[in-house]
Amino acid sequence: MTIVGSRRSTAYGRRTAEALAAQMAIRGITVVSGLAFSIDGASHRGALEASGDTIAVLSSGVDLIQPASHRRLGERVVREGLLLSEFLPGEPARPHHFPRRNRILAALGGAVVVVEAAEKSGVLITVEHALDLGRDVYAVPGALDAPQSRDATH
């Protein structure tokens, strides 16, 4: 199950992603995400804290865990899960890498769950890829007036 969402999420969104990932992990479902800020990191943490499997797909080489604040989380994923990248070691994350990473995120999950996505969010690229691949896409309801929930609920 791929879990994606806004890098500018609310506390509710992060708690929800972590709890959802933990419940998936408890049920033996591998959690896939991108190791980015907010929803991605919360998803990996939730899966790991539940002693489940998680796959982190990077937009950089596997030796450059970005953001730097997720280095320890990334190291834990290496020990207890799988860190994956199509980019060569030493290659930093670049803006044009994110859509390529999102394609892999969509392909690896049997379905995609969106937890908060602001208008014009890159998350929607993952959703498009998932739909093209015939994957189910689910959106977690957020506060209807929150900007972070705008495209997740429409």
Label for each model-derived stretch:
Residues 1-154:
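Glycine-biased, small-residue-rich flexible motifs in mid-sequence functional cores and linkers
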